[in-house]
């Protein structure tokens, strides 16, 4: 029986394995492991790719989001408006930066922060709005940014899943005051482990990010801020440099696979992903909705097909928040999605045989 894993990291690395091996050899010969030539080159290349003003590599997506928030030096106890449907790292970054997460509901089609839910969540303590480009679908940024400007708030993109995604022709990472990316190894642009990236519009914000990233280290013997160890290393930067040139082609293949799925599943009793007309989705995750999620997941497992759930427990119901200040607005759409969502394999290395196996297996589950 054809095997279709949810992700296939071996296949993803096959085209660049020799290039990465050669780059690693050069790094080992030189033994400059942090903030060296590969880091500096990748920072320049990815900043240009995002059409951002400034950019900085760091150790993970969670650290990137934390850096992006801390760089603005908000007052302790500031409120950050975030979508309730997101990976928990979005919430963690707010808490780590000394803030209070305020969770709002999502748009029922895009699954991103619903701009119409934001204004009612704003209080005198609100400092920042943090839309998440969930699954690789850009949030509707223009109304969010306008609303933030009207209330003198900052906007930080959580672009952890949005490498190469575009909003009205503009790349994720260039749409707000700052943005945070994750290069976790399963991402569309993934490291060989962990890494992250922040972009910013203001050079002063970037300089504060640099200090925070490296222990507040201003000169050899001087630390001007209480910072962190959030550096990206040369090995991860070398991997990302090897992968970046293929990102657009890989995203295009994800869109082609998603289109095949959408057509094949159009008559079935399920909801397929919606790509907003203003967005160029990168399909980091191909997420469907069905009332029979657990049954379908079990059936696909029997067919040797991997699935996932992104995400089963809404952020506002996580036990970690019981002792942490937070607010949750009405979240009916989030609750419904978390009860019904299922992720199917959708990545550029899938073969035609694997794609057809997924299509046939899903079709057999729902019947004629």
Could you say what each language-model-derived stretch is?
Residues 1-30, 37, 345:
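N-terminal "arm"/small-domain region of PLP-dependent enzymes with the aminotransferase-like
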Residues 10, 38-45, 49-55, 116, ...:
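PLP-dependent aminotransferase class I/II
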Residues 31-79, 93-97, 103-105, 170:
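Phosphate-binding glycine-rich loop
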Residues 56, 81, 102, 155-156, ...:
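Structural detector of well-ordered beta-strand residues that form the stable sheet scaffold
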Residues 70-159, 166:
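PLP-dependent aminotransferase-like
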Residues 92-94, 147, 171, 188, ...:
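Hydrophobic/aromatic ligand-binding patch that stacks against planar heteroaromatic rings
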Residues 157-190, 220-224:
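Conserved active-site segment immediately N-terminal to the catalytic lysine
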Residues 174-211, 217, 234-237:
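Active-site PLP attachment segment
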């Amino acid at each position: 029986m054809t095997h279709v894993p949810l992700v296939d990291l071996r296949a993803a690395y096959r085209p660049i394995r020799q290039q990465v091996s050669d780059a690693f050899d050069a790094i080992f010969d030189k033994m400059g492991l942090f903030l060296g030539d590969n880091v500096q080159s990748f920072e320049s290349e990815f900043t240009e790719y995002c059409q951002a003003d400034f950019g900085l590599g760091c150790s993970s997506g969670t650290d990137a989001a934390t850096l992006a928030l801390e760089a603005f030096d908000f007052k302790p106890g500031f409120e950050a408006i975030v979508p309730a449907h997101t990976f928990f790292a979005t919430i963690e970054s707010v808490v780590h930066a000394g803030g209070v997460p305020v969770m709002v509901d999502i748009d029922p089609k895009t699954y991103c922060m619903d701009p119409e839910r934001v204004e009612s969540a704003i209080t005198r303590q609100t400092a920042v709005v943090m839309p998440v480009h969930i699954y690789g679908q850009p949030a509707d940024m223009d109304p969010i940014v306008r609303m933030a400007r009207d209330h003198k708030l900052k906007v930080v993109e959580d672009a952890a899943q949005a490498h190469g995604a575009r909003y009205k022709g503009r790349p994720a990472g260039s749409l707000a005051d700052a943005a945070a990316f994750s290069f976790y190894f399963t991402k569309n642009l993934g490291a060989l482990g962990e890494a992250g990236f922040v972009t910013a519009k203001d050079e002063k914000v970037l300089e504060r990010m640099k200090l925070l990233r490296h222990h507040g280290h201003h000169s050899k013997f001087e630390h001007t801020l209480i910072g962190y160890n959030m550096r990206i290393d040369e090995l991860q930067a070398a991997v990302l440099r090897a992968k970046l040139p293929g990102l657009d082609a890989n995203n295009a293949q994800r869109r082609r696979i998603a289109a095949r799925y959408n057509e094949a599943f159009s008559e079935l009793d399920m909801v397929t992903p919606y790509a907003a007309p203003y967005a160029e989705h990168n399909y980091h995750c191909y997420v469907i909705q069905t009332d029979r999620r657990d049954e379908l997941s079990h059936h696909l497992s029997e067919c040797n097909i991997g699935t996932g759930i992104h995400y089963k427990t809404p952020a506002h119901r996580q036990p970690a928040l019981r002792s942490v200040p937070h607010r949750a607005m009405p979240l009916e759409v989030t609750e419904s999605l978390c009860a019904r969502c299922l992720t199917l394999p959708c990545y550029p290395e899938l073969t035609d045989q694997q794609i057809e196996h997924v299509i046939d297996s899903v079709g057999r589950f729902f019947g004629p």
